[in-house]
């Protein structure tokens, strides 16, 4: 079975490519490299022993999609491609709706044209909006998303759901991620965003590597045990394996299938800092800053439905997330290819 991975050279996409190949699938990658590097490709070959076909292009380009579908017998698509910086989405909403929503529409149209009616969509827990009831369960209605990034994910979920209702042959799997961190245990691939990081751990890693003098912790007065915000963190390889489990369980079943991918436990910012210090042997200086508007005190998944339906659950704990992250950062102080 051959699977097209859009955004396959990115953080989650590259780890999912590894998991796919190691699970016996053939993979094809499409990526425009706007937030990743083609230098990941030889590293994927080193890990998997396979040359994964790669196309540099945009999901909004119907011609390159038609080329891929004509040159490969694609049976399913795992769709990661999209922009994901919350702050940038507020400043440039049209960019996000154009890439994330319109791009997904073009992809769905070309899939239908090619007779490929199985898609796994990389959604996000941001679609739950500012819901304060935790844990988050799949039967909770999407909330008022706080930014265009989250809104774009909710729109694509709705669009794919409507497409499946109109053509019941489709299998649509919607995966709502929580906070992926960690790296492949080899230290060959990991998170290396272009520009400003969007997540906590890359900032911690920049402090550890000396690129930042200290970490800013936004909010020290939340109603949590240590006053800092708490989030559900998941190892990126557990997340990658969740895609395979969902595809195996529901990829051949028509309908819309919605799953949370999280650990079911929340860790505070200070817990993450302490765990990273233990893994690296380094001190991470930090300063408590005022809360950011829209940030919640605590959010985490209820992954029980996912386990019941697919058999998937997380296997890697917080310490392994930190150890793998530190191995990645310490072995790759520059950028891919530097």
UniProtKB/Swiss-Prot annotation:
The keyword NAD applies. Gene3D superfamilies: NAD(P)-binding Rossmann-like Domain, UDP-galactose 4-epimerase, domain 1. GO terms for biological process: galactose metabolic process. InterPro entries: Epimerase_deHydtase, NAD(P)-bd_dom_sf, UDP_G4E. Its EC number is 5.1.3.2. Keywords: Carbohydrate metabolism, Galactose metabolism, Isomerase, NAD. It is an enzyme of class 5 (isomerase). It catalyses: UDP-alpha-D-glucose = UDP-alpha-D-galactose. Involved in the metabolism of galactose. Plays an essential role in the incorporation of galactose into meningococcal lipopolysaccharide surface molecules, which are important for pathogenesis. Catalyzes the conversion of UDP-galactose (UDP-Gal) to UDP-glucose (UDP-Glc) through a mechanism involving the transient reduction of NAD. Homodimer. This is UDP-glucose 4-epimerase. It comes from Neisseria gonorrhoeae.
């Amino acid at each position: 079975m051959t699977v097209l991975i859009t955004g396959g050279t990115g953080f989650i996409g590259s780890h999912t490519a590894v998991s796919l190949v190691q699970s016996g699938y053939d993979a094809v990658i499409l990526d425009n490299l706007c937030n990743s590097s083609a230098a990941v490709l030889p590293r994927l070959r080193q890990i998997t022993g396979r040359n994964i076909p790669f196309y540099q292009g945009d999901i909004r380009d119907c011609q390159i999609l038609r080329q891929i579908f004509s040159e490969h017998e694609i049976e399913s698509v795992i769709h990661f491609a999209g922009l994901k910086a919350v702050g940038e989405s507020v400043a440039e909403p049209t960019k996000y709706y154009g890439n994330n929503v319109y791009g997904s529409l073009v992809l769905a149209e070309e899939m239908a044209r090619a007779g490929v009616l199985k898609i796994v969509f990389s959604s996000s827990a941001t679609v739950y909006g500012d819901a304060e009831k935790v844990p988050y369960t799949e039967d909770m209605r999407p909330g008022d998303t706080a930014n265009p990034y989250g809104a774009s994910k909710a729109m694509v979920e709705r669009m794919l759901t409507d497409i499946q209702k109109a053509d019941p042959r489709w299998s649509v799997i919607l995966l709502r991620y929580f906070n992926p961190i960690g790296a492949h245990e080899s230290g060959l691939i990991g998170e290396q965003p272009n520009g400003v990081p969007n997540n906590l751990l890359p900032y911690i890693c920049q402090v550890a590597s000396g690129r930042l003098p200290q970490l800013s912790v936004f909010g020290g007065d939340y109603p949590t045990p240590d006053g800092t915000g708490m989030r559900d963190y998941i190892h990126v390889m557990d997340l990658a394996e969740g895609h395979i489990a969902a595809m195996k369980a529901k990829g051949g079943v028509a309908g819309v299938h919605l799953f949370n991918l999280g650990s079911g436990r929340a860790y505070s910012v200070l817990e993450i800092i302490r765990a990273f210090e233990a893994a690296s042997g380094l001190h991470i200086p930090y300063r408590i800053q005022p809360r950011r508007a829209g940030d919640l005190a605590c959010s985490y998944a209820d992954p029980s439905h996912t386990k019941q339906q697919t058999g998937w659950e997380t296997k890697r704990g917080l310490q392994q997330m930190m150890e793998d992250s530190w191995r990645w950062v310490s072995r790759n102080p520059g950028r891919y290819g530097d």
